[in-house]
Amino acid sequence: MKNQIAAATARLRHFLAILSLPVLGACAAAVPQLEPEQFVNGIPFSQIVDGYGILQDGEFSLPPVPPEYLQGVNRRAVVPYTGYQSAGTIEIDPHAKFLYWVQSDGMAIRYPIAVGREGRGMSGETVIRRKVEWPGWTPTANMLRREPAIYGPFAGGVPGGLASPLGARALYLYRGGRDTYYRIHGTNDMSSIGNSGSAGCIRMFNHDAIDLFDRVPLGTRVVVRTYADSVRIEGEALANRGVELPPVYVDPQQVYAAVAAQNARHGNLNDGVVNEVR
């Protein structure tokens, strides 16, 4: 009797196992196939960081910022503000490579920046008296004198657009009614953000330059944080963030070829929309 029961149980198990095969097969067939990963400018779509994707800005389309340049603190963020400035002020920390747009609720929007050689000479307080969309660029007399081989080919200037070293936006800083020739601006050199560059003033990712530009009005105060304050507020590690980057040689033929192609598509541009206090 026990043998009969055991045999019957075995047959039942076998029968149930057979019945389960089509069900399992049907379940397996119902699993959707994954689509191939999509890429944007060589970046996997799934890795594009929110706020730094493709950005259509008027006639121009900005590429996404590669995620390797947005690691850790090197991206835009709303953070508690622990500095000493009042709401509505821009505070630049050239040591920790941050720019703060101070809010009224004890918070600030913190942007990562790069600080060029000219920017390292900034100190004290200035005021934004001019804002330009897609600004053109001309090297200063000091730049031409200091490194004629690099800047000489650009003495005639580069019109506003994707090829301009000032990027998508520029904020022009004045003191006592006079242009200081210091700028807060975008950049095409995304790898420089978070570091010290060989040239330029205060650089931002173009996405961040546009974001800041749209927030700050003309007349905004801009204050540069001292190294001592940077250490007190950020800590010694962040106050010494980044590395000194070597000079980057840019082929003028490539730049002006890009300008010619841009002019063929959009017409001859110099500066885009200009807002200024006169």
State what each model feature region is:
Residues 2-12, 20-202, 206-278:
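N-terminal pre-domains immediately preceding structured catalytic cores
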